[in-house]
Amino acid sequence: MSKTLRKKRHWLSKVQECVVSWGGPAGPDPELLHGGAERGEFPYLAGRLPTGAEGAPGPALLSGKAPAPGDVLLEVNGTPVSGLTHRDTLAVIRHFREPVRLKTVRPGKVINKDLRHYLSLQFQKGSIDHKLQQVIRDNLYLRTIPCTTRAPRDGEVPGVDYNFIPVEQFKALEESGALLESGTYDGNFYGTPKPPAEPSPFQPDPVDQVLFDNDFDTESQRKRTTSVSKMQRMDSSLPEDEEEEEKEAVNGSGGIENKEKHSDSSDWMKPVPSYNQTSSSMDFRNYMSRDETLEPLPKNWEMAYTDTGMIYFIDHNTKTTTWLDPRLCKKAKAPEDCEDGELPYGWEKIEDPQYGTYYVDHINQKTQFENPVLEAKRKKQLGQTDGGPSKSVPEKSLFTRDPSQLIGALIRTSLKKSTMGFGFTIIGGDRPDEFLQVKNVLKDGPAAQDGRIAPGDVIVDINGNCVLGHTHADVVQMFQLVPVNQYVNMTLCRGYPLPDDNEDPVVDIVTATPIINGPPVTKGDICLTSQELIAGTVVLDQNGKTGPMLVNGRLNGPSMDTNEQRISVASSGGSQPELVTIPLVKGPKGFGFAIADSPTGQKVKMILDSQWCQGLQKGDVIKEICHQNVQSLTHLQVVEVLKQFPIGAEVPLLILRGGPPSPTKTGKMKDKQESSGSLEALSDAIPQPMPFPPTAVRSGSPKLDPSEVYLKSKTMYEDKPPNTRDLDVFLRKQESGFGFRVLGGDGADQPIYIGAIIPLGAAEKDGRLRAADELMCIDGVPVKGKSHKQVLDLMTSAARNGQVLLTVRRKIFFGGEKQAEEDESQAVVTQNSSPRLNRAEFATQQSPEVYDVCLQRKENEGFGFVILTSKNKPPPGVIPHKIGRVIDGSPADQCGKLKVGDRISAVNGQSIVELSHDSIVQLIKDAGHVVTLTVVAEEEHRGPPSGTNSAKQSPAPQHRPLGPAQSSASSTDRGATEGEAGKEVSNSYRLSWPEHKHLAQPDAGSASGVGSRHSQAQNSGCFPVELERGPRGFGFSLRGGKEYNMGLFILRLAEDGPAVKDGRVHVGDQIVEINGEPTQGITHTRAIELIQAGGNKVLLLLRPGTGLIPDHSLAPSSLCPYVKPEQH
């Protein structure tokens, strides 16, 4: 799936290089180059270079793309010239023999001619822009001296280190524009004056310093610029994103361009070289110059840049990203072999003002205070090399994706898949730099009979496809897709030991065949640390709770022999599971049923037309289709299998029926990935959460693109908003279509809504679809973030099939007790072979009074009502728009249905709950002379229910207005009048987030671990906090993350930091969301990235704690020093 979007990229992607000859020893004409630091500008080209041959009179372009007039000159033969005067820039150019290599960039929002603008921008420390700012200052200080209003310190020489001037003189320089940058640090003013156009006779020639001073980048050289670098600038601002032309997005992420476009220019992504970074703490993400000693990146790897210019690497084989250069992995040394000042591969040194100096192991995701090199050498001297924190580094260096670099003997074999599989288990592949190895060879299996495969063999090649670096799930799926009685050709390498037993992450049996009260079912079963799980087999314990069934028949029992293959399922409740073969005939509109993802496989979600699927029941799990095993296939792959059969074909289905029902709807699991057996497959499916902990089982489906998973999880697979319910609506197409219109999708963040319901159309006859419902899925394809045209294309595709399955989200405005949302308990009525919800489904609740009001006005009058809009974003479920005034004698007054205080949820069938006030006013104006308002009566509209009828008895948040909602003519808050000549503006009411905090403790008694509570209770008692970055960050540090098997908690609060000043953040509070992304299951590093990605603001959703921080077993990380206060 691809879509067109406007990309924003770093200016490095616009850098151009060319080779120029000036046509004589005098060098370039001074008029060809303008700008210079004395004018407060970068050097830039004033004219276009003519193309010509070398040796011809005048300047000539010999190779590369000619820079355009106005392009900024960054480098000459690899030497940065930014910050030099015009005279010194020409001197550097003339110093080199012809031809010379120029590096230029087209001016943009971040880097342009204005040197003062670039120096005023804030960049992340360590980024290429931050580095370039330091280079500019170093070049400036060759000709100028920074000034300050503080007194000289011991050892400082006036006129050498700083010019020490009074405050009045400093402000005079600032007002005259003589300072390139200015600001305050530690209560004193600092500034960098413009250098003079002509140097004094006592100043040395800067060319030698710029070109050959190896100590130019040392700490001693920069000591005097520390205050200037860290000062609070007067005109500081964040950089704007550079906009690029429209490009095709890949997998919806828009992140990667087609490399074929750059086949002639392999260096197109390389940054400007020689902004030298010394052998300091940032070795693991060094800015790479044209280092010819480095070989090309491995196959399907790509080097890319963050928005701030940081280099990272994309592995398209595993669809993962890393800071670590894969080419340096082969050159990695053991820690004890590293020299002083050198760090092992994958390590980073952090100098933190609060925690001091510590070291981060990015490979093993650990932190420690001791230098890993000194630690390894110390332990080597003491003879205690075991257990060192970098023990895995030598092992990592053995990994390679190049088969020619493998150590050991290559073994080639061909195995025939039996009903028992291939007869061996595999281990590894949990990380991109980990081999997949044979764990066990099962007795009497094809591998044992072949005799050539042994434990420890590394899987190199499967049917001609190199799998070095592939994930565990990818390789398992490749084996599972081989039909029974077919051969697979394999290449293995013998010579690598198996990892220790305590490091075995996951073992997959590609072969074992469980017996479930019937014939064998071939499936790649999954086990964790020698405990095998039959995917989807769920039993009940004595308390009636669900849990995974181990192959030895015990729940969560001790480990078992991995060679165990045959089991029988013992159930303490529910019907006995059975395998049933059902013959089906494909009708003109498909097989007549819809399927959905479930923990046990693809299950029958809905019977649409029983005449074509007689014998099939809702809840049946599909195991085989026409004798083809489909247990390991994704949702869309099963749909494709069903689609390939022609109309009238007889297709036998092997299904699993009975046994204890697995949870079908929980707080964390929604069967949204639905599709009819004959629907069009349009996007990738997302695996649904399992009813037992996700760490206990690995998915057999290939790993999805992280950006795709993230985008989709932000649409409908995250916790759905409270006070909403999701509905599945199946419609059959009539001659006039499906009978409804679609609104929205005008922008990337604009939701899609159901518009008008066409009278006598399919939607109205069905009765379940309503105007203003938010459209979530079309035939299982999420539509959030899609454009209006893309949604129409999906509907057109559905129309060709004659039917559509819609998933819509509807807001609920409570008037009493909460309505039960379990879809499975709702009655289903079938009319004309179409499922239909019972119209009495709301009979048990006090429904709020929601009605439509149609107003008609004359040419010379308005509608006669005033809409007030909440100034602050209210809590979910609260409509922010209400009637503030009804004008006497107006159409609104004459209709008698509008009252002051009534909430307006839709205009002309379009939901306005999420719209701004100005958008609503414009919507009413565009309606012309007739407008239809969807009204929620004032006395019926209440906040979210508390669970009881008394707010005082409930610990749930209560929303109460903090200020009056009366009108005020003097206010400039949002509000408008419709139907009057003048514009009357009113104070909009405000709703507060609850002041008191309620801690919702997780239910530890449920074996499933997921879905034991209703989705609305997940964030119960949580409160949002928005913090603005201060001079040293957001003022808090974190503890926890997935790698520590714990959630994320507030560890410390910095004194006088933004978090302390806010007053709501306390030590021990749990972080539930960061900038809208749930923190469940994310790593410590990912949490830091989310905080940094927010720029100058961060939005946290916190759950109040007890003041105590949960401990974990990793002592070196107990202080979580990786989280730097200055960064968040």
Curated annotation (Swiss-Prot):
Family annotation (PANTHER family): MEMBRANE ASSOCIATED GUANYLATE KINASE-RELATED, MEMBRANE-ASSOCIATED GUANYLATE KINASE, WW AND PDZ DOMAIN-CONTAINING PROTEIN 3
Biased composition (Pro residues): 193-204
Domain of life: Eukaryota
Record's function text: Acts as a scaffolding protein at cell-cell junctions, thereby regulating various cellular and signaling processes.
SUPFAM superfamilies referenced in this protein's UniProt entry, alphabetically: P-loop containing nucleoside triphosphate hydrolases, PDZ domain-like, WW domain
Protein name: Membrane-associated guanylate kinase, WW and PDZ domain-containing protein 3
Cited InterPro entries: GK/Ca_channel_bsu (IPR008145), Guanylate_kin-like_dom (IPR008144), Guanylate_kinase_CS (IPR020590), P-loop_NTPase (IPR027417), PDZ (IPR001478), PDZ_sf (IPR036034), WW_dom (IPR001202), WW_dom_sf (IPR036020)
A Pfam match: WW
Bias-annotated ranges (Basic and acidic residues): 257-267
Major localisation: membrane
Annotated PDZ domain residues: 22-108, 412-494, 581-657, 728-810, 852-939, 1024-1106
Ranges of compositional bias, category Polar residues: 946-956, 965-974
Gene Ontology biological process terms, A to Z: signal transduction
Domain WW span(s) in chain numbering: 295-328, 341-374
Comp. bias (Acidic residues): 238-247
Signal peptide start and end residues: none
Region feature (Disordered): 184-276, 658-688, 939-985, 999-1018
Gene Ontology MF terms in the entry: ATP binding
Binding site for ATP: 123-130
Keywords assigned: ATP-binding, Cell junction, Cell membrane, Membrane, Nucleotide-binding, Repeat, Tight junction
Lineage, uppermost ranks: Eukaryota, Metazoa, Chordata, Craniata, Vertebrata
Annotated ranges, domain Guanylate kinase-like: 116-290
Membrane topology: Peripheral membrane protein
Gene that this polypeptide is encoded by: MAGI3
GO cellular component, as recorded: bicellular tight junction; cell-cell junction; cytoplasm; plasma membrane; synapse
Cellular compartments annotated: Cell membrane; Cell junction, Tight junction
Organism from which the protein derives: Gallus gallus (Chicken)
Keyword Aminoacyl-tRNA synthetase: no
Protein family: Belongs to the MAGUK family.
